[in-house]
Amino acid sequence: MRTPHLARLIAAIGIAIVIVIGVALTSGGRPMITANEPPTTRPTVRFQGLPPTTTVTLTPRPTSLSLDGVNPCTILSSSQRADLSLDSSPTPYTDAEFDKAKACSIRGLESGTVARLALVLNMGADVWLSDEAQVQTQTVTADGFPAIVVRTPGLTDACNVEVDTSDNEFLDVLFRDGGNTPPIPQDTLCLGAQRVAEAAVSSLKLRH
């Protein structure tokens, strides 16, 4: 049976995408979405028919990067945001759907992309490698730290990277298409999420 924490985390990914879109539409007075307007109700995400990933494990962390007390909107520097084509001001919010995790949305006006960083402080990133999660995963690294690329069934316009930063903590990076025509391929979005994760870890390492 799927644990309550895991079920809420999976649901939070779909809900976070709606929140990120809403922030992009309202924070600067300029519509970010030119197509695929967000639904008025929460999306239903189904998890069926994907292979289990229980045999995959994360590599050891080189050190620990505690996220407790970190402001997610200050993780990426202005120069890093420029390099990632995220040219708007970071917008903080609290993910009320998942234990009030601190999160930050940053959009790219020219690139038509949106990035979201969220700090999960009550479980480890390896929760995504459980077959209970029923998502498509690929283990990677982010500036030397173990990470997982997560593709959620039914959500092709976004990609997540979960960085194993410390025991029972991880950095969740969401990178999504902001309504481009044609839409950005998910493979490209996953590469974008990895770039954001790399930059975020690089910045966090300077704080420790």
Regions found by a protein language model. Name each.
Residues 1, 61-64, 180-187:
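Short coil/turn segments at secondary-structure junctions
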Residues 2-34:
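Hydrophobic single-pass membrane-targeting/anchoring helices
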Residues 28-98:
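N-terminal "mature-domain start" segment
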Residues 73, 104, 190:
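Short cysteine clusters
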Residues 77, 85-88, 108, 200-204, ...:
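Sec/Tat-exported extracytoplasmic proteins
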Residues 79-84, 111-115, 167-168, 197-201:
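Extracellular/mature segments of secreted proteins
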Residues 83-150:
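Short, solvent-exposed recognition patches
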Residues 138-208:
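A short, solvent-exposed beta-edge/loop patch
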